[in-house]
């Protein structure tokens, strides 16, 4: 079996820096023959995770993309790490469309999108470190 494809990035807190992470996902996914539409969903989840890390974290954002070329069931794992104050992911309310449409604050869809687009999502957070680990299998969802 082939070795995993691993890419590590440190993103600056700069406009459009999250797009560097999407390029890494694209390259890694192509190497394990992920379908284009599946890669688009993974990239959207990664953008959301990176934007959250940049908005709520402190300093640089660390991203690791690993494409596992398992012959029968290849999968992509992405971890996004920030060093902000941390948060309780279980305390983030699930957005309700009708409420968001009436609210002046339309944001707050990021975690819900990530959870819907990926097969597995694990969030660990404490003061100084938040890690969002996401997995998507080819043929998943």
Predicted features along the sequence, with ranges:
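Conserved beta-strand-loop-beta-strand hairpin that lines the nucleotide-binding pocket
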Residues: 1-8, 54-141
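STAS-typified acidic loop motif
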Residues: 8-20
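Conserved short strand/loop->alpha-helix "switch" segment adjacent to the catalytic nucleotide/phosphoryl-transfer site
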Residues: 19, 23-47, 69, 103-106
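Short, well-structured hydrophobic secondary-structure segments
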Residues: 45-46, 50, 54-56
